[in-house]
A protein has these predicted regions:
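N-terminus-centric sequence/structural signature that marks the extreme N-terminus
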Residues: 1-104
């Protein structure tokens, strides 16, 4: 199971966030990514790879100032991905990446 941690606000530093986030690394030991949100906040994702381990498939995914993290597996995502690929350029082969263009 992956680890997801988020914080909205400006009263803690990136270093403090990372210190606490590192305590959950056993839940997502394969890769880690932390993103600072311009409006004030931090979101982190530690990955437990199920469908491959590429840097392009690393979350949070970003599209038009929207961030997405997903701790799940989307079954039957390929037909949806094919339909969306007519208007959206996918950066990875991750099943979860379909959620951002679906949201928009």
């Amino acid at each position: 199971m992956c680890s997801i941690m988020g914080y909205l606000g400006t009263s803690i530093s990136m270093e403090e966030f990372k210190k606490h986030f590192d305590e959950t690394i056993s839940r997502g030991p394969d890769m880690q990514k932390i993103v600072e949100i311009e409006s004030g906040g931090i979101i982190g994702f530690e990955r437990l790879s199920i469908m491959g381990l590429t840097k392009e498939g690393m979350q949070p995914f970003e599209l038009n100032n929207n961030l997405l993290v997903c701790n799940g597996e989307i079954y039957c995502f390929r037909p949806i991905r094919e339909r969306l690929s007519e208007t959206y350029h996918f950066m990875s082969t991750s099943d979860c990446e379909i959620l951002l263009p679906l949201y928009e």
